[in-house]
From Swiss-Prot:
One Pfam short name: MJ1316
Source organism of this protein record: Thermococcus onnurineus (strain NA1)
Family matches, as HAMAP family: UPF0248
InterPro entries: MJ1316, UPF0248
Protein name: UPF0248 protein TON_0940
Domain of life: Archaea
Protein family according to the UniProt entry: Belongs to the UPF0248 family.
Length: 87
């Protein structure tokens, strides 16, 4: 699993030419969705200072639970998810 903030991990996936952002997605906390989580491809997000954007929607970084490669490998997750806790 990669180290650093989720914003740093996403910036690397989006801007590092060695990575293909199409190979990754994020899982966000999204109340009302099935299981209160939503899956978003990294290629659809734009990074901001305290938020990221999906179309016109502005979403705070703290809503991101995991960053996952399409093969299922978790490359970043919140500390509470690493401990096996869930909300």
């Amino acid at each position: 699993m990669r180290k650093g903030s989720v914003k740093e991990v996403l910036a690397k996936l989006k801007y590092d030419p060695r990575e293909d952002e199409r190979d990754y997605y994020i899982i966000i906390e999204h109340r009302g969705a099935y299981g209160d989580v939503k899956k978003i491809p990294v290629e659809l997000i734009e990074l901001g200072h305290g938020y990221f954007f999906v179309g016109d929607a502005q979403i705070p970084y703290h809503r991101i639970r995991r960053v996952v490669k399409k093969d299922g490998k978790v490359i970043w997750e919140t500390r509470k998810d690493r401990r096996g806790e869930s909300d």
